[in-house]
Amino acid sequence: MAQILLHGTLHATIYEVDELHGGGGGNFFSKLKQNIEETVGIGKGVTKLYATIDLEKARVGRTRIIENETTNPKWNESFHIYCGHLASNIIFTVKDDNPIGATLIGRAYVPVSEVLDGHEIDKWVEILDTEKNPIEGGSKIHVRLQYFDVLKDRNWARGIRSPKYPGVPYTFFSQRQGCKVFLYQDAHVPDNFVPKIPLAGGKNYEAHRCWEDIFDAITNAKHLIYITGWSVYTEISLIRDSRRPKAGGDQTIGELLKKKASEGVRVLMLVWDDRTSVGLLKKDGLMATHDEETEQFFRDTDVHCVLCPRNPDDGGSIVQDLQISTMFTHHQKIVVVDSALPGGGGSDKRRIVSFVGGLDLCDGRYDTAFHSLFRTLDTAHHDDFHQPNFPGAAITKGGPREPWHDIHSRVEGPIAWDVLFNFEQRWRKQGGKDILAPLRELEDVIIPPSPVTFPDDHETWNVQLFRSIDGGAAFGFPDTPEDAAKAGLVSGKDNIIDRSIQDAYIHAIRRAKNFIYIENQYFLGSSFSWNNDDIKREEIGALHLIPKELSLKIVSKIEAGERFAVYVVVPMWPEGIPESSSVQAILDWQKRTIEMMYKDVVQALRAKGSDEDPRNYLTFFCLGNREVKKSGEYEPAEQPEPDSDYQRAQEARRFMIYVHTKMMIVDDEYIIIGSANINQRSMDGARDSEIAMGGYQPYHLANTQPARGQVYGFRMSLWYEHLGMLHDTFQRPESEECINKVNQIADKYWDLYSSESLERDLPGHLLRYPIGVASEGEVTELPGFEFFPDTKARILGAKADYLPPILTT
């Protein structure tokens, strides 16, 4: 049967199965139980029935488990499924769960052609065995389906049409109005980084300084300081710019937090407990998180620091539980404090302020837009030398260090309370003692959630909080699928999941009308659509929709004869030894993802009779730096190993700038910033825990003319950082002139970066991602570049036969 593209939203309900052991099949379950008892040795067998929904081989929904109901299991569960899949059938599978794996009972097939017209269908569908024959007793499953094509969505490709746009639907947190947002590029912005970027209303864009603001927020807190992190390192200092000193700025963050706790401030920290059983990755040079040191530092002090493992929700199998607790992390990076009212005028009243983004408060994160490799080794980075990509790298052997590019945000107003509530949910689940600040008792002091801007303030923001998290990490999630759905949560096989970050990305991409700009540490997913010549797609499981949504958006614009551009910035390779099998495996997934997208774009261009370069619509970059030697530079006492990547990079005076960002800008009007990568770990909801904000300024929308608010100013400031220049064409990123200009500059910078010799510093950091695109969209090596410069690491990656995909996707 021909496969048809389902691109839109599928509403599905699974009601029940009738008479599972009818027609003489009564011994079916007893045989099943006996078999399980023999293989697993668990005593008397118990049936644990659940049903799943697949679009071909892509799992898009699953019910809870119903125990000991062998004849007529009733789930009555509804699903809201975003889809971008080629499929001939919507497949309902009934299974009996085992401690290890599950036993197939049968599958029911609904042809995609039946739902295409958008009418609701409600029917009993025959359950078939693996040979497509009816199972014993002729059992049927009762389902309801209704498909809403993306073209019928009134927001499709129309941007945010009105200041009253209500935000992403079906989410745990609703959108908040009357908020303030500060956007941060890198941990610090020095005074000499001042691009002139005019905004609406005659203002110029002003940069903010993340770690200075976090230092001030912690220093001035009086009642509470809540921190979550993948890593928090007590030995780092937040203030390092000698031209911008602050009182107390020489303290480490550990000493600062101890001091605040001793003053009576409630300081609570949830730091990921790195269960070192992830040895597979550890030896490949992934950075230690200092979790044990951090806990030790605060032991027997007034700071409550809890090491927080990524515990599974209650409903998984033995294998799933093992995977979650040993392979996945707590990845949210937030700081929540109480703060003085703006322009407080001597008032004792306090409000809540929160920070959300990609920056952990740990070593290797402090950097500026200049991302120097060698010139800060005797100043800001002498005691914070971070280079996990070379074995044995150390300050004593010299640079290049690994520069760090990241993005963060500060949110004020009602949205800041949502971040606080997220912390409280997590603390109640895994924090141990109930020592959260008693907000009810403090209501005379801390004002309740309320707008911090007037409705007519042109700088106001509407902001929504999104997460990837499940009931294993957040307290108070509903128990039943019905209540979960009402709360904007997804129910799975006995776990309740908040997957709203993925939903937010999907909605923003579907709304986009002109361009999308992405910076992310990873870029892989939509594995259901990868080329499957040498892999079994269904075994990969990187099913999130983001890459496919991007390519389908471009395709729709090509078909409509309209311009659209997608710019993606990723690191050269994921942090770690680049030749290692884990890094090579991730690069292989990334290549397959990019290739899938380019094939979609090329196919659409060819269908229009165009042989245009697909890079005019979709283009990938990385960041790097290269510096000539200057007199007075730090001189290391030792040398790197001869003929090592380290030694070659030191001689060539170049290295990648690590892109750790997790950000997307749409049409210069909407921005998502958070901790979530574009991979399955971050977008799944039941893997790594994540948090993000999505927001826009209702007075700065891209309706009749291009948006010129803070989001535009921030993007232009980022482009100034990466390109070393501003140009008029950058104001219209969707235009062919702009994407050609950016591609040309990035191609030139790559040539300078990768050349044998260097006459002067690299004029900018944005480099072409070193891959080619062949005539049918296949991703190929750039001529002469099988390996990243100074390494023996293949740019296109390599399949890892012994690493399970769940670890690297």
UniProtKB/Swiss-Prot annotation:
Cited function: Hydrolyzes glycerol-phospholipids at the terminal phosphodiesteric bond. Plays an important role in various cellular processes.
Gene Ontology biological process terms from the UniProt entry: phosphatidylcholine metabolic process; phospholipid catabolic process
Entry cofactors: Ca(2+)
Start and end residues of each C2 domain: 1-125
Classification via InterPro entries: C2_dom (IPR000008), C2_domain_sf (IPR035892), PLipase_D/transphosphatidylase (IPR001736), PLipase_D_C (IPR024632), PLipase_D_fam (IPR015679), PLipase_D_pln (IPR011402)
Similarity comment: family membership: Belongs to the phospholipase D family. C2-PLD subfamily.
Signal peptide: none
Name this polypeptide is given: Phospholipase D alpha 1
A GO term from the CC aspect: plasma membrane
Pfam short name (any one): C2
Domain PLD phosphodiesterase: 326-365, 655-682
Reactions that this protein is recorded to catalyse: a 1,2-diacyl-sn-glycero-3-phosphocholine + H2O = a 1,2-diacyl-sn-glycero-3-phosphate + choline + H(+)
Active site per UniProt: H331, K333, D338, H660, K662, D667
Molecular function via GO: calcium ion binding; phospholipase D activity
Domain comment (free text): C2 domain is a calcium-binding fold, and the binding promotes the protein association with membranes. A lower affinity toward calcium can be anticipated for PLD alpha due to the absence of two potential calcium ligands.
Binding site for a 1,2-diacyl-sn-glycero-3-phosphate: H331, Q521, H660
EC numbers, comma separated: 3.1.4.4
Keywords, in A-Z order: Calcium, Hydrolase, Lipid degradation, Lipid metabolism, Metal-binding, Repeat
Residues holding Ca(2+): D186, H371, H405, E721
Highest rank taxon of the organism: Eukaryota
Major enzyme class: hydrolase
